Amino acid sequence: MKSKIFSFQIGWKFRRYWKNYTIQSLLATGSVFIVIYFLSMQHAVIVASIGATTFIVFAMPEGLTAKTRNVIGGHIVGLLCGFLCSLVSHPSILSSALVYALAVGVSMFIMVATDTEHPPAAGTALGVAMTGITLPVLIVVVLSIVILSILH
């Protein structure tokens, strides 16, 4: 009996829509390149969050979390929660872990309450809580989510 652990097949959707997938992947690559170019690796969590948003927008465009309301609303919630949590004093490792976890938990709660669920935005909250927010970070995140929503 053959092991199927490492076997995979190219699906019929790829064979049919390979041009679309290629264009989507190139657009995603360009989008993430621009984000990485403008943000330092100090903001790796935020870059990863935008990367995950890029995947959702291009690979799952019909999904609930790919909707413009969710992408923009979720990241705005993430930015705000992360910023507010970054203002809380956290002098120890334990208090830092608690503040960072609260950024994720509170942003998740607000996204669910406002119907703006976008999982990568919890990463934005975490990244901003950990590194703080600067004008360049704010501009890059907002421009990224707006551009991704337009391309969607």
Predicted regions and their residues:
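Transmembrane helix boundary and interhelical junction motifs in multipass membrane proteins
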Residues: I46-I50, H118-T124
